[in-house]
């Protein structure tokens, strides 16, 4: 992290910390880079402390529109804004401003402090000699938010869910339990949304985020780094 200042919505400069964001070289290897900004705990913006400023891929709407539609569809997704980013008074062009998926993300949606799991199998998160399917191995997941006083290393809730996924292929009783943990209304809405925006970017290989709520005994997906493969055909 590097020290910096940012102009707040009230026009006043405030101390912040900033660093490059993302594992993929496309985020930081070129002139325009993706950034992560961390605010002071007592100087939050819209009840969020950490924001990601990411580079649009191709047309700006292909990243922005899916996140906007996710909220309308009732799918968990970070808030996104199209902003013009300035660094040292020089415009860097249009960026996506996204809230980070963390404890603040939960609080902003009136969700009790619970576990959020990150599933990635590419770039620095890639582990050798282990299969590529995230849903086959709990060791391929890490926590980005922790339930109350629970230990960060405790992933028993995730292990239970993944075990149910495997057992459900041959066991009706396990499938019945899985339907209570992974509710149809959560996962069907997630799948329908992916079909709507024509995206499979959240998959068993990468970009998976799960909210595990031990109080309710449920696990549901979060939209992360979604990309739409729709094309706009301009009419003459």
Describe each model-derived feature in a short phrase:
Residues 1-65:
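Conserved NTP-binding catalytic cores of kinases and kinase-like/nucleotidyltransferase enzymes
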Residues 182-191, 206-207, 218-220:
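Alpha-helical scaffolds flanking conserved acidic
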Residues 12-17, 86-87, 108:
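Carboxylate/His-rich catalytic cores and anion/metal-binding grooves
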Residues 74-78, 90-189:
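Internal "kinase-insert"/substrate-recognition segments embedded within catalytic cores
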Residues 54-90:
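A conserved helix-loop-beta module that forms one wall/lid of the active-site cleft
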Residues 199-236:
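Catalytic activation segment of kinase domains across protein kinase-like and atypical kinase folds
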Residues 193-195:
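Conserved, well-ordered alpha-helix/loop/beta-strand core segments that scaffold catalytic motifs
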